[in-house]
Each structure stands twice: as C-alpha cells, then as structure tokens.
Amino acid sequence: MKNNVKRLLALILALAMSLSLFACGQKQDGKQDDVQADTTRVFTDSCGREVTVPADVQKVAVSGPLAQMVVFAIAPDKMVGVANAWDETAQAYFDEEYLSLPLLGQLYGGKGELNLETLLAAAPDVVIDVGEPKGSLAEDMDALQEQTGIPFVHIDAYLATMDETYAMLGDLLAMPNEAQGLADYCRAMYDRVKAIADSVDKANILYITGDEGLNVIAQGSYHAEVIDMLANNLAVVDEPSSKGTGNEVDMEQILNWNPAVVIFAPGSIYSTVADNENWQTIPAIRDGRYYEVPMGPYNWMGFPPSVQRILGMQWMAKVLYPDAADYDMYETTQTYFQLFYHCDLTAEQYAALTAHSLAAD
C-alpha cells in the first residue's frame, strides 16, 4: 500500500514538472486567471483534516469503487470518471453517459492504480475517498493533495452509519436535500433490519466465496457486517481477512461447521453443490436452504462493501426470516434502484436478479 502511494507521488511529480513547462508559456496572456480566485471554504473530513475546497463543487473524482457507489447515488452528474469499469450487468440499468465516463483507477487495492494523467486532465474540484480508513490514510491524502493541487477528502462509511456518510457528502457537495433523502432511507432500512435481527433466533450460516467454494467471510471482518448482524456466522478464525475473497479453509472445516444455511457469492459454486457428495452431507444443501447473492449492478452483499449492502441486508433478512421480514422484496428493490441507481427496475429484471436468491413460495 505504502509503495503504491509512493510510486503515485513520483509519477505526479514528473507529470507536474512537464505541465509547469507548458504553463510558463501561457502566463504572458493569462493575467485574467490571477484576478479570478475561486470561492473556497474549509471542510473537515473524517480523518479530522481541514481541507480547503471550492464552495460550489461541480466536478468530483472518486478514489475507489466504494466511493464510486456512494457518490453515484447523490451526484452522478458531478462525477468526472469512475474508479473501476462498471460491471457488465450495469449496462441494463445505467444511462450511456455514466457508462462512458473515463476510467481513473483506484488509490488502494484493486487491479488498476490511480491514472494520474486522466485524473489531472479531468480537473476535479475534489477527490473523494469513502470507506474504512487505512492506517496511513491521512498522510497519503495530504501527500497526494500537496503534489496534485487537488483537494483529497476521506469520509468514513460503515453499515450502521451510512446516514452520517451521506450527511457529510451533502455538506461537502452543497446538496443537503439530496443527502437528507438518502440518509433517511439508509437510517430507516438499517433500523428495520436491525429490529428483525434482534427479534429472531439467528440462523447458523456460512458465506462462501471463491470458484472452488473454499473461502469464507469470517466473523468480525469489515465484509461480514451484514452477516454478523443477521445470523450466527459460523466462520470464526484467528485472523479474519480484510479482503473480499475472505479466508481460505478446507472442506473438512466446512463440514465441521455444519451450517443450516449457506449463502454463496456470485461466481462461486452455487450451481454445482447439489451434485457434490461432500456438500450433500451439509444440512443447508440437503434441505435446500442455500442461496446465491444477487449480482446486478453489484454484488448486493458487498465486495466492495459499500452502500449496496443496505439493499443486501434487506434481501438477507427476507431469505432467513421471511415471516419477520414482512415486506415485498420487489418493491423494496425498486425503491433502492430508484434512489441509488436512478433507474426503474422492471419485474422481469427483478426476476432475473433473484432467480437463485429467494426461498421458493
């Protein structure tokens, strides 16, 4: 992580030097730029950093996929690019203007690091990082901000406090009304599902990932927030992984855990377990209590663990405790898609999304 940021800073410095040579030739006829100072204000981010930002932010870049999802809900028209290319499933839901946004890359993790030339060419008013703070985050933000001249801010995002995340975004972007609607929704849906979780005998479950089905999302990890709230997560390990792939285990351990319900991540082995002798001995598989997480336009349970988990937790509550979760899942999904993806979900699209994801009536 540290090496990645250091490499970025070196690239920024080299690029900035080349740009400064070009700028020298422009100053003679650019005096009007000196007399038109932008109106700014100070924004305090979740790291406690006081960052000078434009009072009227119009162009936003995101540092990674978590921020991409969160910011898209409130200000899609302010985004100058995306951290990751949209998943193919997004094409059915998003307008072309959003699908064709430039690819900026991401600051932490992932396959593609931040594309500095594209970022600087996009000239954002601010770069927004959203999620769980990394150990060196404040220092990284300060260094990148100093080298690029672009404000970098971090806003914490946790499942239980997504309303606070949107309140801070609303302040930063001067969009209080839009932020309030999203914040109120996140608060109400979290509280609804938390009330369900507090009222039931929790099911013993495993969340399985990986193309061989030998990875689990362990209790206590950032990725397990929904699972740990709604169920008795049997995957207890010494060092829960912070990665979306989870912790690798063996089949013997899965058999020993003996889950009553199994949730499979998209792209895992959901479609083959019914014919696998080892898996057939597990109560969840034998009794037909196994499900695949809906995928579209993102994995509803996270990975990356962003705001879409607000929808995922409502889905998981419906799967595990249908009597307590006495809401219509199609209407619930429609509302989420309208608020966060700015699209109307058809009954046919919903049926395709949840084909392997709901208990049979």
Identify what each model region corresponds to:
Residues 19-23:
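C-terminal motif of bacterial Sec signal peptides marking the signal peptidase cleavage site
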Residues 61-63, 80-83, 103, 126-130, ...:
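Structural recognition of the beta-strand scaffold that forms the well-ordered cores
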Residues 108, 216-245:
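Alpha-helical, coiled-coil/dimerization segments enriched in small aliphatic residues
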Residues 67-122, 126-133, 232-235:
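A short, structured surface patch at a secondary-structure boundary
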Residues 46-48, 102-117, 240-251:
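Short helix-initiation/N-cap motifs at beta->coil->alpha
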Residues 1-12:
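Bacterial N-terminal signal peptides that target proteins for export
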